[in-house]
Amino acid sequence: MKKLLSIMATLLLISNISFAQVKWSVDPAHTNVRFEVNHLGISFVDGEFTKLDGNIETKDSTSFENAKVEFEIDVNSINTRVEARDQHLKSDDFFSAEKFPKMTLKNATLKKSGKGKYKLAGELTIKGVTKPVSFNVIQNNGIITDPWSKTRAGFTASTVINRFDYNISYDDKLPSGVPAVAADIEITVNVEVVKN
């Protein structure tokens, strides 16, 4: 009986080790979320969100295949380098930041699509609207150990969303019919994560 209990305990321990998750935290000092949108049909305006948080869970420390990803952005941290424009973007014409202060990416999974390349599919919530989204992701130079003995990895993720899908409904147009602000928003995320 004691031998049986010992075997069962060993199997349970092995099982727990096998399913242990490795957790990685976003390093906000080395991460940025940038966006770009066409203005008046003749140029582009870009900006970024400066406050964010996130984490990744992997099956081990050597691969991000099938990793689980969550991300949260503070809408009020929007910065286009023009204060009046930033305030307009926080208004109900765009993000309604007072009512919807967070954007989130949840239930997202990385799937390998090539050497150092992934697809990230998940649920993006902006202004209370949740839609499926897919990012193209490049892993930058694998996994490294920094000079302070921390394990790090870096990624660049990109996608395009239609802002009207998320009720970002500002729709002023020129007399010619060209929108003042285009529908498509290009998003680029440069993210650095540190193993916990």
What are these regions (language model features)?
Residues A20-N196:
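Low-complexity, acidic/polar, glycine-enriched regions of mature
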